[in-house]
Amino acid sequence: MFIMIKKSELAKAIIVTGALVFSIPTLAEVTLSETTVSSIKSEATVSSTKKALPATPSDCIADSKITAVALSDTRDNGPFSIRTKRISRQSAKGFGGGTIHYPTNASGCGLLGAIAVVPGYVSYENSIKWWGPRLASWGFVVITINTNSIYDDPDSRAAQLNAALDNMIADDTVGSMIDPKRLGAIGWSMGGGGALKLATERSTVRAIMPLAPYHDKSYGEVKTPTLVIACEDDRIAETKKYANAFYKNAIGPKMKVEVNNGSHFCPSYRFNEILLSKPGIAWMQRYINNDTRFDKFLCANENYSKSPRISAYDYKDCP
């Protein structure tokens, strides 16, 4: 166990920097539309009475599509077309509503992996929403969510990630597309702490990505494959106390990428989407789908350790 700052201190630090949060378009949305959007039937939806079996990776995405340039393309130009379905706050069960992003032409993939993404303390869905279309365009069903309260702690965010995954599995549009045994979770700040906690509680979560994570527990027994995104100059959830400690104590497959000169908000800045998209997609493909073709985008031969944008890099199980 290592020394932690008190939650009240974290709250104070974030509130002080609140102007920065709301000055960047993708970090937060002050108001949340409560309009319920009608269900859109997916062209790739498999019969709910008889689900398809998972396909082999090569059946899903051709080798020629898997390139470093494609993985870093932030225009959502993965191998699949995507649609979205809005989940209103009123209809959501156990979380604050959100958006489901899903591929429409992935019938060759069989059942798909599903990923839930949660924002951090005093933040909204918009701060992490870019992960939705990026991952969906690579063959995942993804839900980006708002929390019940922007002040919810990490344990509450873990419960809401869990509820969001259940919501997708039961959804009448995308539920029959999902393999409930191939799940993932992504969270920023306290949401990252929530992803760590969820990984210790739900065995069907095969991969997580804590972004500048904070939790007042060490979580040293995380066996789930974990990609930690750290921010070098994080003064809210200091990297040495949190991200580095979580990474050091994890005992499963693990990788860390630290953004050079990054503040606590580095995972939400638009100009870091290209930097983080490639390892993020590759990690989820490798460990949710067991697609070893993505190994080459996780290792040092992709020059993570030499990039001026990255101040620290480590991959425990680099082949």
From Swiss-Prot:
GO terms for biological process: lipid catabolic process. It catalyses: a triacylglycerol + H2O = a diacylglycerol + a fatty acid + H(+). Keywords: Calcium, Hydrolase, Lipid degradation, Lipid metabolism, Metal-binding. The active site is at residue 189. SUPFAM superfamilies: alpha/beta-Hydrolases. Ca(2+) binds at residues 314, 317. Active at temperatures close to 0 degree Celsius. Pfam families: PETase (PF12740). Its EC number is 3.1.1.3. This is Lipase 1. The gene is lip1.
